[in-house]
């Protein structure tokens, strides 16, 4: 028997048909839907007189456009002030009602960011193929699933046929061994990976994360890492199933139970790469060498340790990269060789599909407990990834820790990750952000994003500038 990678196994299990040109038809188990990339797909179904092939495979929730203040959320959809956002959220409600699709609506206690809701509800499970009209669908690969984003036309195709036309990707293994140091988090690990291989390093690959660091990592940490596989250029990221995976899934609302659970677990335990399986590329990193990371530029690969200085373009031999660095420094308002710890922040955002789960909230609360937000920080907000996360955090009293420190506690949503709702940066403002992208204008026109872990963001909120969280307390 030929040894297979985890990706090979997931692909083969869902292969419906393969053509001579290499294109294939893949069966899709779970389809997650939000308000931004679904309206045209529903219109397409309606115009063709079709219905979703498997309504029970679809789960919807609004996230990108929803407001996160209690004032706006108190009145449900009608309370949304932005007219475009209101239309998008209302349209999702109407479409789901018409086609009989399960939706966690804006004031449902289960509503949240699609990539948080899927795993925590058990709607996304090991061994599944999972798609959504959102590139960060790769998050779900942490469960030992094949998960990736699709375009709006593909959203319609999957609804109509339960299948997707695709080409098989190559296999890449990111192996991180050793032990992470104190204060080094999964977010730091994935930022360090991107810094090493670049934002195009994983292009054309399905990326498996392996090694001791990932075996020791919590499920929520793995979700953070797989979330940013797309920033490393890969379309999909994944981690092999182990006891951590199974313990995480057990008892969740949509997870199997009884005899079906036992059968499922037996199948899931096979979702590992076989010994001797071929990877087209292998990247090895020493986990002990990773330090808390801070992005300084306008690409996720423009990242260094908090101990370092802003890189000098003069030291970059590649003329294209040098030009990009010069542009990034100009946009970010930084100087070459400036210590990272000298960068002051105007706003702090703790949230997004990367870092808004309960472990992230706890880590941030631990840093700010008993302290006060710095006077120069105009705003610091904590936005839980779902109503479930919010309720858990409040049960633990974490919300009160933040509010006592002068940090706002918000309602679930994508929030300041992207400038599609009321939470935005002003031009020239620096933000310590736990999100996944630091492109020009990503958080608002002229906004300057610095990607960090929840603990590092929390420390910046208190200090007013970037500090090494390892020595902060």
Curated annotation (Swiss-Prot):
Per the entry, the cofactor note is:
Binds 1 [4Fe-4S] cluster per subunit.
The protein's matches in Pfam families, at most eight in alphabetical order, are given as: Aconitase
MF terms from GO for this chain are:
3-isopropylmalate dehydratase activity; 4 iron, 4 sulfur cluster binding; metal ion binding
Enzyme Commission (EC) number: 4.2.1.33
One GO biological process term: L-leucine biosynthetic process
Entries under InterPro entries matching the protein: 3-IsopropMal_deHydase_lsu, Acnase/IPM_dHydase_lsu_aba_1/3, Acoase/IPM_deHydtase_lsu_aba, Aconitase_4Fe-4S_BS, Aconitase_4Fe-4S_dom, IPM_dehydratase_rel_enz, IPMI_cat
PANTHER family cross-referenced by the UniProt entry: 3-ISOPROPYLMALATE DEHYDRATASE (PTHR43822:SF9), HOMOACONITASE, MITOCHONDRIAL-RELATED (PTHR43822)
By what name is this protein known? 3-isopropylmalate dehydratase large subunit
Origin species, per record, is: Cellvibrio japonicus (strain Ueda107)
- Top-down, what is the taxonomic lineage of the species of origin? Bacteria, Pseudomonadati, Pseudomonadota, Gammaproteobacteria, Cellvibrionales
């Amino acid at each position: 028997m030929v040894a297979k990678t985890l990706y090979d196994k997931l692909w083969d299990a869902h292969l419906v048909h393969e053509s001579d040109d290499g294109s294939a038809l893949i069966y899709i188990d779970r389809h997650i839907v939000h308000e931004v990339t679904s309206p045209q797909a529903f219109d397409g179904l309606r115009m063709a007189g079709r219905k979703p092939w498997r309504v029970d495979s679809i789960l919807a929730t609004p996230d990108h456009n929803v407001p996160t203040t209690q004032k706006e959320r108190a009145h449900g959809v009608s309370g949304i002030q932005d007219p475009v956002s209101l239309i998008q959220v209302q349209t999702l409600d109407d479409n789901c009602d018409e086609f009989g699709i399960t939706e966690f609506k804006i004031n449902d206690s289960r509503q949240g960011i699609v990539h948080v809701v899927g795993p925590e509800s058990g709607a996304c499970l090991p061994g599944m193929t999972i798609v959504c009209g959102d590139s960060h669908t790769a998050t779900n690969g942490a469960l030992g699933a094949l998960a990736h984003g699709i375009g709006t036309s593909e959203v319609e195709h999957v609804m109509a046929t339960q299948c997707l036309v695709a080409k098989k990707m190559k296999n890449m293994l990111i192996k991180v061994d050793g032990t992470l140091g104190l204060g080094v988090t999964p977010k730091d690990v994935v930022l360090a990976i991107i810094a090493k291989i670049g934002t195009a390093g994983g292009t054309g690959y399905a990326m498996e994360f392996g090694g001791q660091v990932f075996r020791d990592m919590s499920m929520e940490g793995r979700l953070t890492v797989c979330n940013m596989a797309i920033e490393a250029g890969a379309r999909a990221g994944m981690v092999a199933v182990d006891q951590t995976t199974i313990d995480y899934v057990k008892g969740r609302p949509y997870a199997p139970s009884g005899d079906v659970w036992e059968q499922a677990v037996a199948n899931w335990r096979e979702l590992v790469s076989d010994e001797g399986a071929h990877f087209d590329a292998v990247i090895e990193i020493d986990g002990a060498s990773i330090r808390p990371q801070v992005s300084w530029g306008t690409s996720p690969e423009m990242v260094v340790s908090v101990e370092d200085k802003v890189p000098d373009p003069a030291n970059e031999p590649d003329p294209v990269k040098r030009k990009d660095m010069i542009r990034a420094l100009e946009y970010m308002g930084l100087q070459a060789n400036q210590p990272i710890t000298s960068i002051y922040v105007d706003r702090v955002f703790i949230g997004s599909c990367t870092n808004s789960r309960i472990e992230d909230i706890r880590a941030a609360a631990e840093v700010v407990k008993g302290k006060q937000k710095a006077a120069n920080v105009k705003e610091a907000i904590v936005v839980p990834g779902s109503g479930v996360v919010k309720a858990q955090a409040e049960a633990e009293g974490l919300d009160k820790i933040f509010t006592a420190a002068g940090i706002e506690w918000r309602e679930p949503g994508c929030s300041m990750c992207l400038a599609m709702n009321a939470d935005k940066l002003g031009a020239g403002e620096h933000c310590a952000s736990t999100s996944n992208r630091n492109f020009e204008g990503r958080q608002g026109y002229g906004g300057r994003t610095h990607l960090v872990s929840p603990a590092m963001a929390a420390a910046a909120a208190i200090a007013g500038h970037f500090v090494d969280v390892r020595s902060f307390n």
